[in-house]
Structure formats: C-alpha cells, structure tokens
Design a protein with these regions (language model features):
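PLP-dependent enzyme catalytic core of the Aspartate aminotransferase-like
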Residues: 9, 86, 102-144
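Conserved glycine-rich beta-strand-loop-beta hairpin in the small C-terminal domain of fold type I
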Residues: 30-44, 56-71
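Short, contiguous acidic/charged loop-to-helix segments that flank catalytic cores in large enzymes
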Residues: 2-6, 33-34, 56, 70-72, ...
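Surface-exposed helix-capping loop/turn segments at secondary-structure junctions
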Residues: 26-27, 47-59, 136-142
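PLP-dependent aminotransferase class I/II
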Residues: 1-50
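Conserved C-terminal alpha-helix-loop-beta "cap" of PLP-dependent enzymes
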Residues: 67-110, 118, 123
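Glycine/serine-rich loop-strand microenvironments at binding/catalytic pocket rims
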Residues: 16-22, 70-76, 125-129, 133-136, ...
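Non-transmembrane alpha-helical segments in soluble domains
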Residues: 16, 44, 48, 69, ...
C-alpha cells in the first residue's frame, strides 16, 4: 500500500459518479435545503417573535450553511448555554466560532438546527429564548 498526501481521488470519483455533473450536485443540495429550511424557519421565527425588539440579542439570518449566529449581551453567552443545558437543551459551546473557543465579549452562540426534528427544535427554541431572557435580566440588574 502506498499512501500519498493529496486529494482523495477515489472519493472524488465517487462524487462524480453520484452527481454526474454540477447540475446533479445543485439538485442534491436543493434537497438538503428543503430539509433544512423548515428547521431554520422554526428557530428564526422563535427568535424574532420572542426576542425581536428587546435589544438583548441579535442574530443573522443565513442564506445557506448549517448555523445561525446569535449574539447576546456581552458577558452572557456562556451563562445562556449553561442555563439551556440545565433545562435539557445541549448546544454548541459559547464562543465556538472564535479561535480556541475564546470569545472576548462572551456573546456569541452558534445555533445548529440541522439535527433535531422540527418539534424538538420548537421546544429547544422556547427554552433557549427563556434562557436568553433570564440571563439578560440578571446581567442588566447586575450592571445597574
């Protein structure tokens, strides 16, 4: 057996045989989008309906990808993720998008809605939103 450093040619061949051409790949990715879209819509509508206008968090509505980037009040992200975990919602670690996971503002949370079912996401979003509200209230009162 000879091992080389470089592209996995056999895997590339599998992809070419499966997708046939760029149009085949685009069609396949549309199927992924059809599966993911309702999941993202569930989370985004929960954020908008419950946190919109409160000025305790902001988020980006992605146009592709697998994550929603949420920014809390500074100093709250780790506490929000911990509070959600207490209620049974396991999330990506706060600050995971930063090198070594060290968010200098402790404000960024990456939400990954691709795995849970839409029903689970609805409940998880409700818990996340409540966690954001509770931690934000504590932070605002602490800063007064």
């Amino acid at each position: 057996t000879i091992q080389t450093i470089g592209h996995d040619k056999l895997n590339q061949l599998r992809h070419v045989r499966f997708f046939k051409d760029i149009h085949g790949m685009v069609l396949h990715m549309r199927k992924h989008a059809d599966i993911l879209r309702p999941k993202f819509e569930t989370v985004l509508s929960g954020l908008k309906n419950e946190l919109g206008g409160l000025e305790i968090g902001s988020w980006l509505e992605p146009r592709g990808g697998y994550f929603i980037s949420f920014d809390s009040l500074p100093g709250c992200a780790k506490a929000i993720v911990a509070k959600a975990k207490e209620a049974g919602v396991v999330m990506t670690d706060a600050g995971a998008t930063f090198p070594y996971g060290k968010d200098p503002q402790d404000s960024n949370i990456r939400i990954a809605p691709s795995y849970p079912t839409p029903e689970e996401l609805k409940t998880a979003t409700e818990i996340f939103v409540l966690s954001v509200k509770l931690v934000s209230i504590d932070k605002i009162l602490e800063d007064k």
